Amino acid sequence: MFSIAQFRWLFLGNATFFLAMNGQMLTRTLLAWDLTGSATSLAYINLVVAIPMIFASIVGGAITDRVERRQLVLIGQSLIVANEIFILTLMLTGYLEFWHLLCTAFVAGCAFPFIMPARMAITATVVGPDKLQSAMAYAGSVMNLSRVFGPALMGIIVAQFDYKGAYMLSIVLYSSAVLCMFGVGRSRSGRQGDV
């Protein structure tokens, strides 16, 4: 599996992307609490991510089948990087407010349902049908491990370096995922006969 260069890049990109994504869920929630001191803010910050994910998921897979997948992932992940840079900039300048977090969480919630199915479809294209089962097992392992290690890592970073450090790490991880996608060839859309 790892003898396929494009799969190695995709695997590394998946690892950094999902580590950042799952870690950011904790970071964003803790930051919302620190900004507001309100338990209700925790519900709002997670709802504004979840609601667009639910509704965008309905069309995310269909759009993935109709557009160039790598380009879709690059656009979505670049949007996430810009989101994180925006929040870090507001933190560094002292202008961050809770509504900024809500807006950027909503944007992330809209982007994720397009990124994730495109990543899975690219995996199928890169490895082919013979190795697809193994490739999906590796992808699933990365996602599951990142659910444990992402929040743990960000919790340690927040404790040691504050939220600025966590957002810097998040930017590095998300940016690494973007760069890894350049190691993956362009993939045709499903309408052109691709998997």
PLM region spans:
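Transmembrane alpha-helix termini and helix-breaking/packing motifs in multi-pass membrane transporters
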Residues: T29-L35, L88-T93, F149-L169
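MFS-fold secondary transporters
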Residues: Q24, W33, F86-M91, A108, ...
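Helix-loop junctions on the cytosolic side of multi-pass membrane transporters
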Residues: G94, A121, T125, Y163, ...
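Alpha-helical transmembrane segments of multi-pass secondary-active solute transporters
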Residues: L42-I45, L72, A135, A166-S170
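C-terminal ends and interior cores of transmembrane alpha-helices
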Residues: S78-Y95
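Substrate-agnostic recognition of the 12-TM MFS/MFS-like secondary transporter fold
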Residues: W9-M25, V49-A62, E68-I80, H100-A159, ...
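Extracellular/periplasmic helix-loop-helix junction of adjacent transmembrane segments
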Residues: G23, T27-P52
